[in-house]
Regions:
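Generic structural signal for well-ordered, non-membrane alpha-helical segments
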Residues: 5, 111, 201-204, 208, ...
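A short, amphipathic alpha-helical segment
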Residues: 13, 17, 46, 213-216, ...
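Alpha-helix boundary/capping and short turn/kink residues
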Residues: 21, 201, 216-220, 235
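Short, basic, helix/turn surface patches
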Residues: 111-123, 159-165, 212, 216-231
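A short, charged, Gly/Pro-tolerant segment at domain boundaries
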Residues: 221-249
């Protein structure tokens, strides 16, 4: 497994170094949804931990939303094999979003409640950094969502400090493309937990993903061009620690 992960972990390390995501003594939790992105991030950080010059602690936290049929037992078993502390917290987020509030835009409230539950769990454990599985394609999609639906040039930052919680969010996979992640997750036979959310393929983000994929079939470098434009502006928070141009995926 380590041999297969070497190249991918190198991509992760580039982002970590470019944005000084990891410092000596950090206590890092990976927000594990059960999807391929967060599971591969967990494996890559565990691999990086074995040789990175700065020591950091690593654990995994899952916020269980309350959908029937989601079994995180295989995720717990993977964490046991890797000797990574794992916490799975049950919540009623699904019930609140779909049954109580009956939201027209459920994704926004769900994300807000997930973040709140994660931040609470992190504070209780003395963790100072939360690693999220957003990748290269997520960044491009978020930028296009902001441009097309809000009229703004905006995207999440590689590193974000949250004043209210005192937690720093890091996104070590911003240089990793979704296709590479999907292929590697299959090769490693990661225990992916399928998401039964009815909005999983009915959101604006999914529409943008489909649009970008359609355009990329005709213009293969399109996503890289968009990502490069984000870097060259640069968007707030996308400056590297030494002022160099970020290296992209």
């Amino acid at each position: 497994m380590d041999k297969i992960l070497n190249e991918f972990t190198g991509v992760i390390r580039r982002a970590v170094d470019d944005y000084n995501m990891i410092e000596e003594g950090d206590k890092i939790a990976v927000g594990v949804s059960g999807g391929k992105d967060s599971l591969l991030l967990l494996l890559a950080l565990h691999h990086l931990q074995s040789y990175y010059p700065k020591h950091f602690d690593l654990e995994a936290i899952t916020i269980e939303l309350g959908f029937e049929g989601m079994d995180f037992t295989p995720v717990a078993e993977l964490c046991r094999e890797l000797d990574i502390p794992y916490t799975c917290l049950k919540t009623d987020i699904k019930e609140v979003v779909f049954d109580v509030r009956k939201e027209d835009n459920p994704c926004s409230l769900c994300a807000k409640m997930r973040r709140g539950a994660l931040n609470d769990a992190i504070r209780q454990r003395g963790i100072n950094k939360l690693a999220l599985g957003h990748h290269f394609d997520d960044a491009v999609e978020t930028f296009m969502l902001s441009l097309l639906f809000e009229g703004r040039l905006s995207c999440f930052r590689p590193v974000t400090y949250l004043d209210r919680s005192g937690v720093t969010q890091i996104r070590p996979m911003i240089y990793a493309g979704e296709l590479k992640i999907s292929n590697l997750a299959q090769e490693l036979q990661l225990p992916v937990v399928e998401n039964p959310c009815p909005q999983d393929k009915g959101s604006k983000r999914y529409e943008i993903k489909q649009l970008l994929n359609t355009m990329s079939a005709q213009y293969p470098d399109m996503k890289s061009k968009v990502f490069g434009a984000m870097q060259r502006m640069p968007l707030p928070g996308w400056e590297t620690v030494d002022g160099r141009m970020p290296r992209g995926k």
